[in-house]
């Protein structure tokens, strides 16, 4: 029999409904796995007592016929989500042992539907990173290894703890946030499914802000269907978030397995970038063929402003971050370094409390917003952002239903391998994902194969605004054609 923690979320839901096992037994299975996997550093806080208490309540509701949509299903929460009474650090020293007095809307909806909280998951500091190496709690180690090599690999970032935990069977699903690829890139690196919904589909209330016009919450899961189940509970209008969109939430699970016959899929020629890993280029071609075989029409398209996406993103996002992070001063909570006066205390606290990557992005953001450079950089970047969105609008107006691209330019790399000499080397990891955030579109990463070194490779599907259902239908075709890629060597045990 499959270990309880290795069941998919959908299988676990079925087992709980039929009484095959209890929510407490399922939760304990995950807690045991978490205890054996601390070397991965996926969790920064385990909430075992809370999890077992929530599971016991779930068992009562299941027995009385009052089960919610996620009743008894154990999940992990990225440490960017405020959790009432449970420490939340955003992966930064500056927040210290901050305990929020309120719950984020997304997590409150998960608990409303019966999900069980296993703990808080590691992430890059303030979600700034592509490898989960910038966290003040240390890097997350991927459960995957190159064939014949025990060197530790990154799980991707910034939601590296979420991706690693789902891949290593340390939760049935997890929450993530995606500002420039922080769900889709780690999902591709770990053989998991990750979706960034349309901007405004999930509430940002209670999520610690990085770049407010780009941030969006979404789920990680082991299958497309599992991701659909989680997104249904996470999505929805919230009056506490002025950017939340008041649209009804469909049952995304109904879209999984729906026919894609007649759908038009665009292949953007601008994504055929120099230096693209040949294995990823081959998988991209194969993915297009799988969609053709299922009845879709695949067409070449042009997104001409793609080449400006990365510099645009690394102006807009740091600009917003420098504003959002101005509030952290050491006065009320977190790190506090004494100074000669209050201004000196602020400066010393921020210098000690923020890590080097966060300090770098604050400085970039402050620079591009300064009086002498505002028009030259920030205003120009916003104009280019509009052009990038218009490229997608034009393609969708021509009848294209979704766009197929690689999720990442390479498989996972080693811890300490990239970005130490030149941060741009790390920023290039986001080359295929940032356009989606700049345009506010939904994007899903789905496992599509393994590299010659036995590492996961992912494909990305980009959809029209609020048409996540189309993405789930298309992603299911890829999943069925490619198969699933669970970690088969639990080397950390």
UniProtKB/Swiss-Prot annotation:
The record, for Pfam families, names: Amidase
The UniProt keyword set, sorted, is: ATP-binding, Ligase, Nucleotide-binding, Protein biosynthesis
Q: Does the keyword ATP-binding apply?
A: yes
Enzymatic reactions: L-glutamyl-tRNA(Gln) + L-glutamine + ATP + H2O = L-glutaminyl-tRNA(Gln) + L-glutamate + ADP + phosphate + H(+)
Where is the catalytic site? 78 (charge relay system), 158 (charge relay system), 182 (acyl-ester intermediate)
Q: What is its EC number?
A: 6.3.5.7
Q: Which domain of life is it from?
A: Bacteria
What InterPro entries does UniProt report for this protein, alphabetically?
Amidase (IPR000120), Amidase_CS (IPR020556), Amidase_dom (IPR023631), AS_sf (IPR036928), GatA (IPR004412)
Q: Does the keyword Nucleotide-binding apply?
A: yes
Q: What cellular component GO annotations does this protein have?
A: glutamyl-tRNA(Gln) amidotransferase complex
Q: Which GO terms describe its molecular function?
A: ATP binding; glutaminyl-tRNA synthase (glutamine-hydrolyzing) activity
Q: Which GO terms describe its biological process?
A: translation
Tell me, in a sentence or two, what this protein's role is.
Allows the formation of correctly charged Gln-tRNA(Gln) through the transamidation of misacylated Glu-tRNA(Gln) in organisms which lack glutaminyl-tRNA synthetase. The reaction takes place in the presence of glutamine and ATP through an activated gamma-phospho-Glu-tRNA(Gln).
The Swiss-Prot or TrEMBL record describes its family as follows: Belongs to the amidase family. GatA subfamily.
Q: Subunit structure, per the record?
A: Heterotrimer of A, B and C subunits.
Specify the protein name.
Glutamyl-tRNA(Gln) amidotransferase subunit A
This protein's species is: Azorhizobium caulinodans (strain ATCC 43989 / DSM 5975 / JCM 20966 / LMG 6465 / NBRC 14845 / NCIMB 13405 / ORS 571)
Gene responsible for this protein: gatA
């Amino acid at each position: 029999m499959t270990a309880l923690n290795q069941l998919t979320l959908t299988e676990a839901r079925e087992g709980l409904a039929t009484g095959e096992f209890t929510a407490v037994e399922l939760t304990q299975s995950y807690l045991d796995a978490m205890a054996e996997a601390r070397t991965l550093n996926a969790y920064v806080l385990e909430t075992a007592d809370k999890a077992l208490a929530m599971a016991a309540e779930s068992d009562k509701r299941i027995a009385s016929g009052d089960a919610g949509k996620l009743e008894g299903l154990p999940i992990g929460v990225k440490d960017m989500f405020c959790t009432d009474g449970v420490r939340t650090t955003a992966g930064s020293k500056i927040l210290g042992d901050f305990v929020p007095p309120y719950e984020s809307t997304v997590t409150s909806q998960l608990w409303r539907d019966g999900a069980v909280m296993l703990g808080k998951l590691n992430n890059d500091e303030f979600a700034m990173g592509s490898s989960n190496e910038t966290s003040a709690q240390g890097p997350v180690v991927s459960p995957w290894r190159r064939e014949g090599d025990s060197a530790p690999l990154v799980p991707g970032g910034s939601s590296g703890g979420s991706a690693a935990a789902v891949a290593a069977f340390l939760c049935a699903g997890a929450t993530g946030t995606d500002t420039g690829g922080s769900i889709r890139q780690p999902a591709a690196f770990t053989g998991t499914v990750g979706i960034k919904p349309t901007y405004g589909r999930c509430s940002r209330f209670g999520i610690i802000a990085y770049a407010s016009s780009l941030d969006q919450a979404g789920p990680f899961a082991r299958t497309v269907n599992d991701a659909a189940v989680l997104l249904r509970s996470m999505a929805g209008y919230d009056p506490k978030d002025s950017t939340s969109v008041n649209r009804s939430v469909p049952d995304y699970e109904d879209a999984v397995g729906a026919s894609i016959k007649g759908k038009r899929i665009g292949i953007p020629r601008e994504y055929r970038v120099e230096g693209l890993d040949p294995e990823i280029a081959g998988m991209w071609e194969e993915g297009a063929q799988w969609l053709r075989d299922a009845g879709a029409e695949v067409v070449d398209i042009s997104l001409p402003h793609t080449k400006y996406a990365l510099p645009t993103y690394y102006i807009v996002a740091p600009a917003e971050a420098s504003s959002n992070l101005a509030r952290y001063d050491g006065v009320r909570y977190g790190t506090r370094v004494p100074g000669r006066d209050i201004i000196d205390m602020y400066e010393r606290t921020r210098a000690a409390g923020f890590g080097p990557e966060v300090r770098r992005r604050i400085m970039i953001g402050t620079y591009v917003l300064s009086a002498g450079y505002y028009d030259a950089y920030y205003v120009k970047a916003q104009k280019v952002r509009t052009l990038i969105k218009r490229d997608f609008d034009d393609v969708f107006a021509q009848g294209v239903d979704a766009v197929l691209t690689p999720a990442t330019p390479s498989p996972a790399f080693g811890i300490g391998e990239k970005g130490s000499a030149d941060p741009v080397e790390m920023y290039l990891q986001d080359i295929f994902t940032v356009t989606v955030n700049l345009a506010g579109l939904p994007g899903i990463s789905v496992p599509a194969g393994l590299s010659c070194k036995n590492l996961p490779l992912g494909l990305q599907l980009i959809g029209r605004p609020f048409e996540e259902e189309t993405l789930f239908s298309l992603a299911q075709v890829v999943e069925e054609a490619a198969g699933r890629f669970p970690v088969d060597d639990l080397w950390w045990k």
